C-alpha cells in the first residue's frame, strides 16, 4: 500500500496488526469473518481518499491483507482529518478532478456528495446489508440510492475524572459550597458548577472544554441547543436558533470562557487538540466521542488519565427529557467517476467486514454498526479487569437507542456551519452579546439558504 497526502505516512498500529492466515473469508469457524477477498484483482490499483488522525488510521494497516489476497494495489492519495478530507472531496468533486475510487463519507456530510458517489444498493446483497444497523442504512439511503457503507458510529458521551469526583475532600467542599452532593453531572447547570469548582480548588487546569472552530463547534452548540429544547431549523429549513434554547446554549458557552474555565486557545481547537488536553490530565469533565476511549485508557499514550476516568450519558438542559447526543457514522463511498467500481466495492466490503470492524471497535472503542460485531465486543470486554471496558458498551447501546441525533441532513450543512461558527466564536469570546450574535447568526443563515435556493 502506498500513500501520498499531506501527511508523511500512515503510522503503524501494532494493536491492529492483521495476519493473513488463509485465503478464505474467515480465519476459523469461531473467528470474525472477512469479506471482499474472493476476487482476483491482480493488476488493479484502487485509489483511496481517507480520513486520518487519532485512531482512524490504524484500520488501514489491514489493507496489506487485502492486497496480498486479491492481488490489488491500494494507494491512499489523500489522508486528512474530517474537515481536511471534506474540503478535499468537495474541491475535487466540483472540479471534476477525481483521482480516487474509494472515499470517506459521513452521515452528517453525505447530502452534499449525492451527485458524486455511486449508488451502492446494486453492489450489496440484502444479506450483506442486513449485517449493518438498519437505521443507519435507512438514513444513508437518499431517493432510493444507498450513499455509503458505514464503518463505525459515534455519539458524544460525558467523560469525567473519577479521581476528582471520588475525592472525599473535594466532595465535602463542593457540597458545603453548592448545597448538593458532588456526583457525575446530570444537567448542563451542574456541569458548569463542577467546572467552576474544580478550577477554583486548583484541582484541575480546565473545568471543561469543547472544540472551538468549524463544524466541530457548530455541532457542539447543536447538541446544547437540542438539550435545551431547541433546534437550528424548523421543518421548512427556516433558522430558529435565536430562541430561548439558543440563548441558554450560547450563554453557557460564553460564561465558561469568561470565567476562565475553558482553555484560552479554545477558538483554535479541533478534535485532536481537546483530546490531548484530556489525555494530559488538564480537564475535569467534557463531552467527547467514544472513539477516543482506547487512546485515553492506554497508559503509554495517556498515563495521566488511563484508569482514572468514567463515562456517562450526556446531560440535559432546559428540556429535562432530552440529553445531549450529537451523533453520526463514518463510512466509505465509491466515487461515481471511478474507473474501478467493482474493485473499489471489494475494498469497501473488506474494510467494513466483521473481522476488520471488530478489531477497530474492540481496540479503539469505536461504536460498531454491525450486530455481529456488537455481540463480539460485548463478549470480549466482559472480563478485562476494568469494569468500564464493558460498561461503556451498555451506555453506548442506551445512548444510540435513545439519544442519537444527527445534524440537519441537507446538502449545505457545512456551508451553514462555515457561515455560523465565526459568529459563535465571537459570542464565546465576548466580542458580541449572546442576543446580537444569535440574531446575526439567524439572519446570515437565512440569507445563505436563500442564496442557495432553499
PLM region spans:
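Hinge/lid segment of periplasmic solute-binding proteins
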Residues: 29-40, 103-159, 166, 189-192, ...
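Short, polar/charged alpha-helical segment
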Residues: 32-37, 54-73, 420, 438
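Extracytoplasmic "Venus flytrap"
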Residues: 33-34, 38-61, 215, 407-412
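Long, aromatic- and glycine/proline-rich binding clefts that accommodate carbohydrate-like moieties
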Residues: 34, 309-316, 362-422, 426, ...
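Periplasmic-binding protein-like
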Residues: 58, 166, 202-203, 348-374
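Extracytoplasmic "Venus flytrap"/periplasmic binding protein-like
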Residues: 64-135, 139-141, 145-149, 168-169, ...
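Helix-loop-helix "hinge/cap" segment bordering the ligand-binding cleft or interdomain interface
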Residues: 68, 75, 125-126, 141-217, ...
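Extracytoplasmic/periplasmic substrate-binding proteins
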Residues: 110, 219-228, 248-340, 346
Amino acid at each position: 500500500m502506498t500513500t501520498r497526502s499531506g501527511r508523511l505516512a500512515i503510522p503503524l498500529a501494532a494493536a491492529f496488526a492483521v495476519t493473513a492466515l488463509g485465503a478464505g473469508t474467515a480465519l476459523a469457524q469461531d473467528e470474525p469473518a472477512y469479506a471482499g477477498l474472493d476476487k482476483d484483482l491482480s493488476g488493479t490499483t484502487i485509489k483511496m481518499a481517507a480520513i486520518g488522525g487519532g485512531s482512524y488510521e490504524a484500520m488501514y494497516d489491514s489493507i496489506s491483507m487485502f492486497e496480498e489476497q486479491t492481488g490489488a494495489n491500494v494507494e491512499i492519495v489523500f489522508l486528512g482529518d474530517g474537515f481536511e478530507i471534506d474540503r478535499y472531496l468537495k474541491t475535487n468533486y466540483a472540479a471534476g478532478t477525481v483521482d480516487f475510487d474509494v472515499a470517506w463519507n459521513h452521515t452528517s456530510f453525505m447530502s452534499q456528495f449525492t451527485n458524486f458517489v455511486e449508488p451502492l444498493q446494486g453492489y450489496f446483497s440484502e444479506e450483506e446489508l442486513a449485517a449493518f444497523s438498519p437505521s443507519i442504512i435507512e438514513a444513508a439511503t437518499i431517493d432510493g440510492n444507498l450513499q455509503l457503507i458505514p464503518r463505525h458510529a459515534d455519539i458524544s458521551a460525558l467523560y469525567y475524572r473519577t479521581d476528582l469526583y471520588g475525592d472525599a475532600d473535594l466532595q465535602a467542599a463542593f457540597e458545603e459550597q453548592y448545597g448538593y452532593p458532588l456526583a457525575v453531572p446530570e444537567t448542563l447547570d451542574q456541569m458548569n458548577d463542577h467546572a467552576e469548582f474544580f478550577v477554583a480548588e486548583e484541582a484541575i487546569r480546565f473545568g471543561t472544554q469543547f472544540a472551538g472552530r468549524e463544524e466541530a463547534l457548530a455541532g457542539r452548540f447543536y447538541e446544547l441547543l437540542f438539550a435545551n429544547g431547541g433546534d437550528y431549523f424548523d421543518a421548512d429549513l427556516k433558522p430558529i436558533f435565536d430562541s430561548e434554547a439558543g440563548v441558554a446554549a450560547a450563554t453557557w458557552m460564553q460564561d465558561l470562557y469568561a470565567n476562565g474555565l475553558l482553555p484560552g486557545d479554545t477558538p483554535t481547537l479541533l478534535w485532536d487538540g481537546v483530546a490531548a488536553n484530556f489525555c494530559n490530565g488538564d480537564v475535569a469533565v467534557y463531552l467527547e466521542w467514544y472513539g477516543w476511549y482506547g487512546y485515553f485508557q492506554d497508559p503509554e499514550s495517556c498515563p495521566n488519565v488511563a484508569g482514572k476516568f468514567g463515562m456517562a450519558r450526556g446531560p440535559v438542559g432546559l428540556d429535562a427529557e432530552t440529553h445531549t447526543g450529537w451523533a453520526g457514522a463514518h463510512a466509505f463511498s465509491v466515487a461515481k467517476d471511478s474507473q474501478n467500481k467493482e474493485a473499489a466495492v471489494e475494498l469497501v466490503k473488506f474494510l467494513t467486514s466483521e473481522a476488520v470492524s471488530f478489531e477497530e471497535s474492540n481496540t479503539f472503542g469505536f461504536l460498531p454498526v454491525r450486530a455481529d460485531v456488537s455481540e463480539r465486543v460485548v463478549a470480549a470486554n466482559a472480563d478485562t479487569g476494568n469494569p468500564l471496558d464493558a460498561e461503556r458498551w451498555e451506555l453506548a447501546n442506551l445512548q444510540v437507542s435513545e439519544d442519537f441525533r444527527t445534524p440537519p441532513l441537507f446538502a449545505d450543512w457545512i456551508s451553514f456551519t462555515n457561515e455560523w461558527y465565526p459568529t459563535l466564536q465571537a459570542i464565546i469570546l465576548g466580542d458580541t452579546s449572546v442576543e446580537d450574535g444569535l440574531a446575526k447568526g439567524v439572519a446570515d443563515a437565512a440569507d445563505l439558504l436563500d442564496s442557495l435556493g432553499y
